[in-house]
Regions:
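Short aromatic-hydrophobic micro-motifs that form the base-stacking/packing surface
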Residues: 99, 277
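N-terminal pre-triad scaffold of radical SAM enzymes
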Residues: 89-97
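Glycine-rich active-site/cofactor-binding loop and its immediate structural neighborhood
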Residues: 284
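C-terminal nucleotide
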Residues: 2-13, 18-21, 30-32, 36-83, ...
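DPxDG-like acidic metal-binding loop motif
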Residues: 101-121, 125
Length: 325
């Protein structure tokens, strides 16, 4: 039996520049961090005396006798890619799926990590990220970028640069107290809405040539945000930049936000938030705000109908927390 633990991520700047149509020509950059909310994948070989060859437990339970009959596309393609059968797999998570935290990619990375361990194989972080990207984007044919798989695999607070030739993961090195100050100034709220990121990504790709300049601006903001963090500028400038990138992001597609989300956002700004954004591709999920500590109680009151999620940054990425041959 193998149990893996894989973090979710929050993307601050550069989201959208990690889609192949953009980074292969212009280069992409993302500033993101994983945090201490996780998905857990428990996997083991299933004895052959059952009347089904594999069982998968997630939001529903599947018992199948043929790999092609697995309904969950990610599980089906991971099983085929790893050439596995007679598997029992269970998925658990701290936060719901389809909420802009890279949950499906964390599942993919955690599942691959577990499957490799079941086969007695060591697999490094880059291999896991590359395999998850291939399975989600090629085998599952889902629209989207590549930052989520990289973040889930590597973990930590990173700048990820992407080009036609590949990607580089560069840790953002900050004094412990400054990183804590940033962490303590960020507030996460669940809107109650979920979304399919591939649907939103398809909306972004419509009339894509008209959006190149805005994506280039969003990419340049990664440099600006990194400079704020490492050069000792006031961290409230980071919050103000979140507001600017959110405005740009909304302009990419009409389905990224809606009137309810806009109202929530404006309520937080009026209560004292410097800025914020909807995490992930858009359409629902989690709102992240930068709020000075003395104003956080007012923002919580303004958004009292939303679930507030305290969190801490994490550095480990996917890992095996239980292994028994």
């Amino acid at each position: 039996m193998v149990i893996t633990k894989t973090p979710f991520r929050m993307s601050f700047f550069g989201g959208g520049t990690d889609i192949k149509e953009f980074y292969s020509e212009y280069g992409g950059s993302v500033l993101s961090s994983t945090f201490d909310k996780y998905c857990y994948v428990t996997s083991r070989f299933l004895p052959e005396f059952f009347d089904y060859f594999s069982e998968f437990v997630y939001s529903r339970t599947e018992r199948v006798t043929d790999i092609d009959k697995i309904e969950h596309p990610l599980i089906r393609n991971c099983m085929k890619f790893m050439n596995l059968q007679n598997i029992r797999l269970a998925y658990d998570a701290d936060l719901p799926a389809r909420t802009g935290l890279g949950t499906s990619s964390s599942f993919a990375v955690g599942m691959l990590n577990a499957f490799h361990a079941l086969k007695g194989e060591m697999c490094n972080k880059k291999e896991l990220a590359d395999e998850a990207i291939y399975i989600e984007r090629v085998l599952c044919n889902e629209s989207g970028g590549i930052q989520d798989q990289i973040a889930a695999s590597y973990g930590g607070f990173n700048r990820i640069d992407m080009s036609e030739d590949g990607y580089q993961v560069k840790p953002i090195i900050l004094p412990k107290q400054r990183k804590k100050e940033l962490n303590d100034s960020l507030m996460l709220f669940f809107t109650g809405f979920t979304h399919m990121s591939s649907t939103v990504q398809n909306g972004v790709k419509e009339n894509f040539s008209d959006k190149i300049r805005r994506l280039q601006t969003m990419k340049s903001m990664v440099d600006d945000a990194q400079n704020i963090l490492i050069k000792g500028s006031h961290l409230s400038d980071f919050g103000k930049m979140l507001h600017e990138t959110w405005k740009l992001k909304k302009s990419l597609s009409s389905i990224i936000s809606n009137s309810d989300i806009d109202d929530m956002y404006q309520s937080a700004i009026k209560a004292g938030a410097e800025g914020g954004k909807l995490l992930g591709s858009g359409g629902g999920g989690f709102l992240l705000f930068y709020v000075d500590k003395d104003k956080q109680k007012y923002v919580r009151e303004a958004l009292k109908n939303l679930l507030y999620i305290p969190f801490n940054f994490e550095n480990d990425g996917t890992r095996i927390i239980y292994y028994d041959e």
